[in-house]
């Protein structure tokens, strides 16, 4: 094993703060990207459903207006 103790592992030879901070920043960025993607997908699906319902209402309204 490269590190003798768990404390050495977390300290990373004096660079632990920077190593774990970079992991934390990366994790926050990935989680933010996932949350944003899920929200955007939900918004797009709602817009598609709204547009589909609008088109169906227009077709129903125009159904009786044909010659």
Swiss-Prot record:
Record localization: Cell inner membrane
Highest taxon listed in the record's lineage: Bacteria
Keyword Cytoplasm tagged: no
Alphabetized Pfam families for the sequence: CcmD
Keywords (A to Z) from UniProt: Cell inner membrane, Cell membrane, Cytochrome c-type biogenesis, Membrane, Transmembrane, Transmembrane helix, Transport
Transmembrane segments: 17-35
UniProt protein name: Heme exporter protein D
